[in-house]
């Protein structure tokens, strides 16, 4: 493959972010002072870069940006806080704590993310410390939920295979704990831990990460086939559980996935993780740590858009990666084992698991937990949390599973579901049940177009077409992203939209239904009228001409609307 297709390994001197990390004294910077500075609701850019490692981003309300500029006021600064919640598992007490904190310090809503955790928006600087202390008091934290480190570790919340799921979740939790930064900066700044006198050697402070941490974010997921609801091929490292006779024997190891790109730069692209071998369960920690150190040592620290692990691998090759990994491990991965994914969506409604426990998967449109005039979703879930004795399991599709419900509690929980009309999605189209959107406007500073606030109304219009075509109950994965950074993993959708400008999107078709294939751009920079005009004949053709069991993404490739994308390096071809 031609060299010019690949991002360079390094591109000159280290970026400014590398300087900020190096000078930060292990993520302290001047954050403590900036948070106490009373003249601005914001913080300096250097500290904002460090704030990500603590689980937060400085944002502003973009709906108010122009008006405040006219009034010569600073932007309406506020913070987003993201919780570290390995595998998306929260207790009822933790759910109630997040609900309370969202009303006390946030905008009164919670956002379930595509990485199985909570986000809170609208927190003012003066409330940040109290808010993070409240999260920690509920036995959660926000460490490494953002930043150039390993982020929230995902895990399949599969109610059908609860015993194996429990084992896999334990590994996800162990990975999350083991790969945390070791600096005490978080505890000093937010939890008032006293700083220990003396300066330890850098390898004592961060034995794995070092003082510069990683070149960019790093994401790990663990999946249990046949469910790929964590989109395992989108992860920097994906561990695919291999079951033999119902027992966990180990994990296939996939490397180098990632969804982000930059419009107009063909050296950036979404990429799928590639399987490099198999490890036994007790080897998973060693494999993850050694892969992270490879990215630490070889990732691009000059240009951040070229810094993800996928580019490190694509530049040097899979054989190089395997050789480097085996050298660091001192042993070799085994041959990959066979497995099969059949979907990357959630399975809604009631299911019965082991030990007589029940699980209820509810549809949460775009992950937004809030009360509106006609749908008291937040209140309903709060009432469930008050009586529930199991867990809340957040899914990678922004939904929630009320899990491990005892037979004695099932009737009471179903009564709350009926009282508040909480939905398992059966009364909405299959397209909507398989939809996902990132936050975008008004809080995300990177958004180029609407996403969460727009996709539901676009689906309203697409549902008219689906009804006419007779395919309302046909599962089709549709996702929207407000920018090309890929938080909603739109490049894996059968129908994907990636924002380019207000009201304008690139339309992508042909992603794999089980998250195993990237999509391909079909039309560029189009608005709603052209979106509907474009999709209508394709959806009608699918209704009439599809083969039995054929998914929409496979159909558009077979009929020649787009070519199959075998690798991210061909995404722009």
From Swiss-Prot:
GO terms for biological process: cysteine biosynthetic process; hydrogen sulfide biosynthetic process; sulfate assimilation. It comes from the Bacteria. Pfam families: NIR_SIR, NIR_SIR_ferr. It catalyses: hydrogen sulfide + 3 NADP(+) + 3 H2O = sulfite + 3 NADPH + 4 H(+). Pathway: Sulfur metabolism; hydrogen sulfide biosynthesis; hydrogen sulfide from sulfite (NADPH route): step 1/1. InterPro entries: CysI, NiRdtase/SiRdtase_haem-b_fer, Nit/Sulf_reduc_fer-like_dom_sf, NO2/SO3_Rdtase_4Fe4S_dom, NO2/SO3_Rdtase_4Fe4S_prot, NO2/SO3_Rdtase_4Fe4S_sf, NO2/SO3_Rdtase_FeS/sirohaem_BS. The keyword Ion transport does not apply. Siroheme binds at residue 487. [4Fe-4S] cluster binds at residues 438, 444, 483, 487. Its EC number is 1.8.1.2. GO terms for molecular function: 4 iron, 4 sulfur cluster binding; heme binding; metal ion binding; NADP binding; sulfite reductase (ferredoxin) activity; sulfite reductase (NADPH) activity. It is an enzyme of class 1 (oxidoreductase). Keywords: 4Fe-4S, Amino-acid biosynthesis, Cysteine biosynthesis, Heme, Iron, Iron-sulfur, Metal-binding, NADP, Oxidoreductase. Binds 1 siroheme per subunit. GO terms for cellular component: sulfite reductase complex (NADPH). Its cofactor is siroheme; [4Fe-4S] cluster. Signal peptide: none annotated. Belongs to the nitrite and sulfite reductase 4Fe-4S domain family. Alpha(8)-beta(8). The alpha component is a flavoprotein, the beta component is a hemoprotein. This is Sulfite reductase [NADPH] hemoprotein beta-component. It comes from Shouchella clausii (strain KSM-K16).
């Amino acid at each position: 493959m031609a060299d010019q297709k690949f991002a360079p390994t390094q591109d000159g001197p280290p970026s400014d972010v590398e300087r900020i990390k190096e000078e930060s004294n292990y993520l302290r910077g001047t954050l403590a002072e900036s948070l106490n500075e009373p003249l601005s609701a914001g913080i300096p850019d250097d500290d904002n870069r460090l704030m990500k490692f603590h689980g937060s981003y400085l944002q502003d309300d973009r709906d108010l940006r122009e008006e405040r500029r006219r009034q010569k006021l600073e932007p309406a600064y506020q913070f987003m806080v993201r919780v570290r919640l390995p595998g998306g598992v929260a207790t009822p007490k933790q759910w109630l704590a997040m609900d309370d904190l969202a009303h006390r310090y946030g905008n009164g809503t919670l956002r379930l993310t595509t990485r199985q955790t909570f986000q809170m928006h609208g927190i003012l600087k003066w409330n940040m410390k109290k808010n993070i202390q409240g999260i920690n008091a509920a036995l959660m934290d926000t460490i490494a939920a953002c930043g150039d480190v390993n982020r929230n570790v995902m895990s399949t919340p599969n109610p059908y295979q609860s015993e194996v799921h429990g084992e896999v979740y334990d590994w996800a939790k162990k990975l999350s704990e083991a790969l945390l930064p070791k600096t005490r900066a978080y505890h000093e700044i937010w939890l008032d831990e006293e700083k220990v006198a003396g300066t330890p050697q850098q390898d004592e402070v961060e034995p794995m990460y070092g003082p510069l941490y990683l070149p960019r974010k790093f994401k790990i997921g663990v999946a249990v086939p046949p469910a790929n609801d964590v989109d395992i091929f989108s992860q920097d490292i994906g561990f695919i559980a291999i079951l033999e006779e119902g027992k966990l024997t180990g994990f296939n190891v996939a490397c180098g996935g990632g969804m982000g790109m930059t419009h107009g730069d063909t050296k950036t692209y979404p990429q799928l993780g590639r399987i490099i071998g198999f490890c036994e369960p007790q080897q998973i920690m060693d494999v993850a740590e050694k892969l992270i150190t490879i990215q630490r040592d070889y990732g691009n620290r000059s240009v951040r858009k070229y810094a993800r692990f996928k580019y490190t691998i694509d530049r040097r090759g899979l054989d190089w990666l395997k050789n480097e990994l085996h050298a660091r491990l001192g042993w070799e991965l085994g041959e990959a084992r066979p497995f099969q994914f059949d979907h990357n969506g959630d399975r809604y409604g009631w299911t019965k698991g082991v030990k007589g426990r029940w699980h209820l998967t509810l549809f949460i449109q775009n992950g937004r937990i809030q009360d509106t005039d006609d749908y008291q979703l937040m209140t309903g879930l709060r009432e469930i949390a008050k009586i529930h004795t199991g867990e809340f399991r957040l899914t990678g599709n922004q939904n929630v599973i009320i899990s491990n419900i005892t037979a004695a509690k099932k009737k009471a929980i179903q009564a709350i579901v009926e009282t508040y009309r909480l939905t398992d999605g059966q009364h909405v189209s299959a397209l909507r049940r398989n939809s996902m959107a990132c936050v975008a406007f008004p809080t995300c500073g990177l958004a180029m177009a609407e996403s969460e606030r727009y996709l539901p109304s676009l689906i309203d219009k697409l549902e008219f077409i689906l009804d006419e075509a007779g395919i309302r109950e046909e599962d089709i994965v549709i996702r929207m992203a407000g920018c090309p950074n890929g938080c909603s993993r739109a490049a894996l959708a059968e129908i994907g939209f990636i924002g380019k400008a207000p009201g304008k999107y690139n339309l992508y078709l042909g992603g794999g239904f089980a998250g195993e294939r990237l999509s391909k751009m079909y039309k560029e920079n189009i608005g709603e009228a052209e979106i509907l005009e474009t999709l209508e004949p394709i959806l009608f053709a699918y209704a009439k001409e599809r083969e039995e069991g054929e998914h929409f993404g496979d159909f558009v490739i077979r009929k020649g609307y787009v070519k199959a994308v075998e690798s991210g390096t061909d995404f722009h071809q």
